Every structure is written in C-alpha cells, then in structure tokens.
Regions:
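Intrinsically disordered or low-complexity boundary/linker segments at protein termini
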Residues: 1-15, 19, 117-151, 248-264
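Residues at the starts of beta-strands that form the adenosine-phosphate
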Residues: 6, 32-36, 68, 136-137, ...
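A structural alpha-helix within SAM-dependent methyltransferase catalytic domains
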Residues: 21, 25-29, 83, 152, ...
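Acidic, proline/glycine-rich short linear motifs
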Residues: 22, 26-60, 168-194
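Rossmann-fold cofactor-recognition segment
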Residues: 68-71, 202
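Charged docking surfaces used in two-component/phosphorelay signaling
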Residues: 73-81, 207-212
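Gly/Ser-rich helix-loop-strand patches that form or flank binding pockets
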Residues: 84-131, 220-264
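An alpha-beta-alpha
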Residues: 149-181
Length: 264
C-alpha cells in the first residue's frame, strides 16, 4: 500500500540497486513511509520473467519490509517510465544506486538528464552498502550562486526527521564579488535553519587544497551520513566535474541532490 513519504526505487536486479532498496526501506521505516519498487522491460514477453524475479526479491525480505513495498514491472523506455512514475506518484525521493557519476551515465545514458534535470523530485544517490536508519550529520556545501542553496529545504527536512545536524560549508574563492554572494546565501540559510529549529553549524575549511578535496575530506572526518548538494541545468549532474567528485567520494557517502531550476 502506498503512503507518504514515498521512496521511488528504479530496480534492475543488480547488487547496486539492491543496496538502494535497502536504504530506501530504512528511510521508510524511520519516517513511516513506503517504497515503490519499479523495474522496466523493453518488450511485453520479458514482463512475466521480471515479475517473478521481483517477487523473489521481495519474498527474501522480512515481513516488516514486505509490507512497505508496492512493486510494478513496466513496459517501455526506462528513462520515460521513471519520469512518468515521478510525475504521477510525486515521491519524496528517488533512490538510485550507482558506481559513480560515470556509472549513472553508463546505465542510463545521456537520457539521465531528462530524468533528473526535468524533475523537482530530489534524488538520493548511493554507492555501496550504506545504512540510513540513523542520520546524525549532513554536510551541505554552498557557493555565491543562489542555486547552491536550493537544496536547503530538502536537507533540513531530512535533518528534522532524523534529529541531525547540518554542517554548512561555504565555497570561498577569494573573489570579492563572490564573497558578497556567499555572505548573502549564508544569511538566508541561517535564517531558514533558525526559523525551522534545525540544528546546524558553519564550517570554514582551511583552504590549503581545492575546495572539493577539502569538502569531501571534511565530510569523511565527521562521518557524515549524507552530502546535500544542488545542481542546475547549466551544470548537469552527469557532466559537472564537481558533482561527479561528490558522487564518487571515496567515503561512499550518499548524495542528496535536486534540480534547482525546477524549484523556481
């Protein structure tokens, strides 16, 4: 039975997508939500086999997990079906497993931009076997660009549900014009956190290495469970080198992201 918050999981029977399923179930248990597990086949004759495989996946889960899952095997184009499901179901999160940004591109091809860039649904990307039954620390980078703080409400919502602290990390680049934008964004985010009673702290990195190296090392040092970072159509998820670095972080920290332009 579908109830919200709802976690949409595209599933291809790989170990990677199985990890995404486990993570989504943990989120559903903590937040009294449910999981929509979907597999897409290209032609109708493949549907019966996929349905049996999907049934076996669910049968191997605990009764408590099984109660939270609604499953569907759809026929069509995987990119289009994920988009349709997101539009109809309005999930709180799309939870996807990947080897990394290049892994997403390999699995979904260039059409991943159609799935993600045209949706205001936040995406949780996970690598490896991670757990989210407890989230204590969320690291959120931001810059002088207003789009960089569009992830704030989603990160704050997760922090409130888990009682987590958000570590806000400004990207300082010694450009005076940029510093003004960073200061403005910091004030906006701080006000939002205070008004919504979200625990947070400001973090100043040493600026001894490039920002993203220091950001990821910091996230690893504080044992962050989630990195929350936004993107826009101007810096697409699968091609932006900074987002690739965040997704491919050596600590395998799940990444919460959303298309800022679709939120306007």
């Amino acid at each position: 039975m579908i109830h919200y918050p709802l976690y949409l999981v595209p599933f291809d029977f790989s170990e990677i997508s199985n990890n995404a399923l486990k993570l989504s179930l943990e989120l559903a248990h903590v937040n009294n939500g449910s999981v929509f597990l979907m597999n897409v086949v290209k032609v109708k004759p493949d549907r019966s086999k996929a349905q049996m495989q999907l049934k076996k996946v669910i049968d191997d889960l605990s009764p408590a997990d099984q109660k939270l899952i609604t499953k569907r095997v759809l026929i069509g184009n995987i990119y289009e079906e994920i988009g349709k499901a997101s539009e109809i179901l309005r999930p709180s999160l799309v939870v996807m497993g990947t080897h990394g940004a290049s892994g997403i591109q390999k699995i979904f091809g260039s059409h991943v931009e159609k799935i993600i860039s045209n949706s205001a649904t936040p995406l949780l990307i996970t690598r490896g076997d991670k757990h989210m039954d407890k989230v204590k620390t969320i690291v959120m980078p931001f810059s002088f660009q207003k789009e960089s703080i569009q992830i704030t409400s989603f990160a704050a919502n997760m922090a409130k549900k888990f009682g987590a602290c958000i570590h806000l990390v400004g990207n300082h680049d010694n450009n005076e014009l940029h510093e003004d934008g960073i200061a403005t964004n910091q004030l906006v985010v701080e006000r939002f956190m205070n008004e919504n009673n979200i625990d947070f702290k400001m973090v100043d990195l040493p600026q001894e290495k490039d920002f993203y190296s220091e950001l990821l090392d910091y996230a690893g040092s504080v044992h962050a469970e989630v990195i929350a970072a936004t993107y826009s159509n101007g810096t697409k998820l699968v091609t932006n080198p900074h987002m690739q670095r965040i997704i491919e972080n050596i600590y395998r920290i799940p990444v919460l992201t959303v298309n800022a332009e679709e939120l306007v």
